[in-house]
C-alpha cells in the first residue's frame, strides 16, 4: 500500500465508523410492542387505519354513519367467548399519549406505548383472537392494551348499553408491555 492510499484510509476511517454507527443505531426497530420514544404503528396497522375515524362514544351514537370504520386504544376489562370462535372484549377506552414513557431516556428499548390513566368511555369489540394471543403468559386478557380497528353499525349491547363494534384488525400489548400516564411520576429521570 503506497503512502497516498494509507493517508486516504486514515482520513476516511472515522467517516466510515461514524456511518456504520449511524446506520446501526438508525435501524432500531420498535418491534411488535412499540419500544420507541414515539408511537410506531406496524405496516398492517397503518393499512388497516386508512380511512378510519378515532372512536368517540358520544358522537358515534349521534352520527353512527361517520364511524362506520373506526379505531381506538383501550384496556381490556373482560374477555368472553363469542359465537363461531370469536371473542367478545369489553374495553375501557383510553387516549394514546403523543410520547411514550421510557425508563431510560437514552435507551428506546425501555420505552412503552403509553395511554391515559382514565377512560373516556367503553365499548364491546367482537374480534378473532390470533393463536399467539389466545393462551399463555402473553395472552389477551383483562389488563391488556389493544389498538382496534373496527366496523361500527350503531349497535349497542343489550346488557350494558355500550356500543358494539366488529374488529377487522387489532394490535395487542400484554400487561406490563405498555404504560399509563401515571407511570411518568414513578419513572421520572
Outline where the language-model segments fall:
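C-terminal motif of bacterial Sec signal peptides marking the signal peptidase cleavage site
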Residues: 22-26
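Bacterial N-terminal signal peptides that target proteins for export
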Residues: 2-16
Amino acid at each position: 500500500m503506497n503512502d497516498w492510499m494509507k493517508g486516504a484510509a486514515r482520513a476516511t476511517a472515522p467517516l466510515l465508523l461514524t456511518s456504520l454507527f449511524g446506520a446501526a443505531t438508525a435501524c432500531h426497530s420498535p418491534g411488535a410492542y412499540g419500544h420507541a420514544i414515539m408511537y410506531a404503528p406496524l405496516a398492517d396497522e397503518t393499512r388497516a387505519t386508512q380511512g378510519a375515524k378515532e372512536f368517540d362514544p358520544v358522537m358515534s351514537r349521534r352520527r353512527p354513519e361517520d364511524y362506520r370504520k373506526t379505531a381506538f386504544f383501550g384496556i381490556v376489562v373482560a374477555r368472553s367467548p363469542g359465537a363461531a370462535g370469536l371473542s367478545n372484549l369489553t374495553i375501557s377506552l383510553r387516549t394514546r399519549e403523543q410520547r411514550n414513557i421510557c425508563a431510560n431516556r437514552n435507551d428506546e428499548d425501555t420505552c412503552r406505548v403509553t395511554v391515559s390513566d382514565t377512560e373516556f368511555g367503553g365499548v364491546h369489540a367482537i374480534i378473532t383472537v390470533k393463536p399467539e394471543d389466545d393462551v399463555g403468559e402473553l395472552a389477551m386478557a383483562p389488563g391488556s392494551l389493544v389498538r382496534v380497528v373496527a366496523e361500527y353499525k350503531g349497535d349497542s349491547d343489550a346488557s350494558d348499553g355500550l356500543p358494539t363494534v366488529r374488529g377487522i384488525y387489532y394490535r395487542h400489548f400484554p400487561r406490563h408491555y405498555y404504560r399509563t400516564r401515571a407511570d411518568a411520576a414513578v419513572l421520572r429521570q
